[in-house]
Amino acid sequence: MFYAHFVLSKRGPLAKIWLAAHWDKKLTKAHVFECNLESSVESIISPKVKMALRTSGHLLLGVVRIYHRKAKYLLADCNEAFIKIKMAFRPGVVDLPEENREAAYNAITLPEEFHDFDQPLPDLDDIDVAQQFSLNQSRVEEITMREEVGNISILQENDFGDFGMDDREIMREGSAFEDDDMLASTGASNLLLEPEQSTSNLNEKINHLEYEDQYKDDNFGEGNDGGILDDKLISNNDGGIFDDPPALSEAGVMLPEQPAHDDMDEDDNVSMGGPDSPDSVDPVEPMPTMTDQTTLVPNEEEAFALEPIDITVKETKAKRKRKLIVDSVKELDSKTIRAQLSDYSDIVTTLDLAPPTKKLMMWKETGGVEKLFSLPAQPLWNNRLLKLFTRCLTPLVPEDLRKRRKGGEADNLDEFLKEFENPEVPREDQQQQHQQRDVIDEPILEEPSRLQESMETSRTNLDESAMPPPPPQGVKRKAGQIDPEPMIPPQQAEQMEIPPVELPPEEPPNICQLIPELELLPEKEKEKEKEKEDDEEEEDEDASGGDQDQEERRWNKRTQQMLHGLQRALAKTGAESISLLELCRNTNRKQAAAKFYSFLVLKKQQAIELTQEEPYSDIIATPGPRFHII
């Protein structure tokens, strides 16, 4: 594209054109009218910078679209103007005359209504006040509690008067003070009055008897059936029914302020025909003045009182006083602020970056102990192959070895592991092998020339299978323990003279025996590993790339030694192929794995060709195209 970005940018000269070509809906009417098509077309035909043919074509398309929009808007405006002109000058429309061009005042003005504020109020009789108040008035039955009263004489009397006169008529018969039962009945008629008021009630009854004896035969009323008028209204000779009642003695009404000794004086002035009651003779204790005992009913025996209502005070939860908490420390000193600024442990975390390469990421995922001991070196996607691999990871210990291990018959752990690693060795010959090993280990110090070469194969079967410490260290350890002039018993001297022919050479000659380089390859590797460990201890600051280079160099040396050994073996024996099973005979697992890996590296470099007839069978190596070149 031969154009600069500023030409088609948002504020460029051709921005509207480019937008119209690609996003026509984004343009507004104002953008269309602001766009100058003449200058735009000139800038497209003769641009200041070079533009591609495709870009100029897009810009011309935008010009066409903007021109189309302008023509469309112009046509719409013309149509609207034409319609308005046509509606304004349509035929049949007559102009208004001069006098009708202005609207009437009443037609455009709202009428104003002024109310008469001097109007008299309506009459109160016209307003139904009772009906209005009855709406908010409840019935008595709804707002009043029902009173449950016991056996009262009000319901039993049908005569004139609201109160019964049973006790008073009994006193008129003159038998009121003959028995003490009258006092008990009088006290029983009152429900809530205390028994100490019996004396005052008796005095009141006596005063009523004296007052009513004057009107015993005035023939007013029905005799004993006297009512309230008999007691109150007709109580004076001079007054009529509607006159004010005469002033009664103070003994008629019990007042709380009146002391008790006044009643005692009135009791002494009264003389009755019958015997005096014991209450009137004995001195009466002064009764405490209580405002609650005041009553305005003339006859207290006929009055009743409601039972007290049990008022239970609701326990309100006491409001807890809100305690204002004020921070004692109002300012932070400079030491605290400096400590907070210097402490950045809460915002710093350990750096955990992902490995830079996929290979390192895979090593990190599968480099743990749990992965190394449960997964193969290569990823197996098939579950059946993975099961076949994991089945060999947990070998079963033979039953006799397990019993011997539990019974403590094995001398040490190394001996137990040797027996476990070499189950093909007959159990009957183990004692003889121990004796032979003792015979072999001791004369190595004195005659290492012939005896060591003859017994190397047997020591490989027993010692290297369990991965014991290297022979030079064992020799040094035994040399330190043995005296410079060892005393050899005669039995051991006889065993030393046994020729090596008596050892069981039942196995066929091995390739490692023909070529000592293949046999000494693991020992050389051990020595190199020791040297490498010493170098690693001295150089702890090497990078991971250097470690990988050292590992690759080590594998290259091991592969070179394996290749030279195979070349010499094929040259000496004249064979066309070498068996891996034959090569790994009498070696431990680590040595066999190293040889197998060397085979794979040589196969990758096309030095040898590997064939295998079936899974888990022997691998045959034949010379490859680069067998003699590398």
UniProtKB/Swiss-Prot annotation:
<dbReference type="GO" id="GO:0007062">
    <property type="term" value="P:sister chromatid cohesion"/>
</dbReference>
<feature type="site" description="Cleavage; by caspase-3 or caspase-7">
    <location>
        <begin position="279"/>
        <end position="280"/>
    </location>
</feature>
<feature type="region of interest" description="Interaction with WAPL and PDS5B">
    <location>
        <begin position="287"/>
        <end position="403"/>
    </location>
</feature>
<dbReference type="Pfam" id="PF04825">
    <property type="entry name" value="Rad21_Rec8_N"/>
</dbReference>
<dbReference type="GO" id="GO:0000987">
    <property type="term" value="F:cis-regulatory region sequence-specific DNA binding"/>
</dbReference>
<feature type="compositionally biased region" description="Basic and acidic residues">
    <location>
        <begin position="521"/>
        <end position="531"/>
    </location>
</feature>
<feature type="region of interest" description="Required for interaction with SMARCA5">
    <location>
        <begin position="126"/>
        <end position="282"/>
    </location>
</feature>
<feature type="modified residue" description="Phosphothreonine">
    <location>
        <position position="394"/>
    </location>
</feature>
<dbReference type="GO" id="GO:0010972">
    <property type="term" value="P:negative regulation of G2/M transition of mitotic cell cycle"/>
</dbReference>
<dbReference type="GO" id="GO:0003682">
    <property type="term" value="F:chromatin binding"/>
</dbReference>
<dbReference type="GO" id="GO:0005829">
    <property type="term" value="C:cytosol"/>
</dbReference>
<dbReference type="GO" id="GO:0030893">
    <property type="term" value="C:meiotic cohesin complex"/>
</dbReference>
<feature type="modified residue" description="Phosphothreonine">
    <location>
        <position position="622"/>
    </location>
</feature>
<comment type="similarity">
    <text>Belongs to the rad21 family.</text>
</comment>
<keyword id="KW-0053">Apoptosis</keyword>
<keyword id="KW-0234">DNA repair</keyword>
<feature type="compositionally biased region" description="Low complexity">
    <location>
        <begin position="271"/>
        <end position="285"/>
    </location>
</feature>
<dbReference type="GO" id="GO:0030496">
    <property type="term" value="C:midbody"/>
</dbReference>
<feature type="compositionally biased region" description="Polar residues">
    <location>
        <begin position="451"/>
        <end position="460"/>
    </location>
</feature>
<feature type="region of interest" description="Interaction with STAG1">
    <location>
        <begin position="362"/>
        <end position="403"/>
    </location>
</feature>
<keyword id="KW-1017">Isopeptide bond</keyword>
<dbReference type="GO" id="GO:0000775">
    <property type="term" value="C:chromosome, centromeric region"/>
</dbReference>
<feature type="cross-link" description="Glycyl lysine isopeptide (Lys-Gly) (interchain with G-Cter in SUMO2)">
    <location>
        <position position="48"/>
    </location>
</feature>
<feature type="modified residue" description="Phosphoserine">
    <location>
        <position position="454"/>
    </location>
</feature>
<feature type="compositionally biased region" description="Basic and acidic residues">
    <location>
        <begin position="423"/>
        <end position="440"/>
    </location>
</feature>
<dbReference type="GO" id="GO:0016363">
    <property type="term" value="C:nuclear matrix"/>
</dbReference>
<protein>
    <recommendedName>
        <fullName>Double-strand-break repair protein rad21 homolog</fullName>
    </recommendedName>
</protein>
<keyword id="KW-0227">DNA damage</keyword>
<dbReference type="GO" id="GO:0051301">
    <property type="term" value="P:cell division"/>
</dbReference>
<keyword id="KW-0131">Cell cycle</keyword>
<dbReference type="GO" id="GO:1990414">
    <property type="term" value="P:replication-born double-strand break repair via sister chromatid exchange"/>
</dbReference>
<dbReference type="GO" id="GO:0005654">
    <property type="term" value="C:nucleoplasm"/>
</dbReference>
<dbReference type="GO" id="GO:0006915">
    <property type="term" value="P:apoptotic process"/>
</dbReference>
<keyword id="KW-0158">Chromosome</keyword>
<keyword id="KW-0217">Developmental protein</keyword>
<dbReference type="GO" id="GO:0007059">
    <property type="term" value="P:chromosome segregation"/>
</dbReference>
<feature type="cross-link" description="Glycyl lysine isopeptide (Lys-Gly) (interchain with G-Cter in SUMO2)">
    <location>
        <position position="418"/>
    </location>
</feature>
<feature type="region of interest" description="Disordered">
    <location>
        <begin position="423"/>
        <end position="488"/>
    </location>
</feature>
<keyword id="KW-0137">Centromere</keyword>
<keyword id="KW-0963">Cytoplasm</keyword>
<feature type="modified residue" description="Phosphoserine">
    <location>
        <position position="46"/>
    </location>
</feature>
<feature type="site" description="Cleavage; by ESPL1">
    <location>
        <begin position="172"/>
        <end position="173"/>
    </location>
</feature>
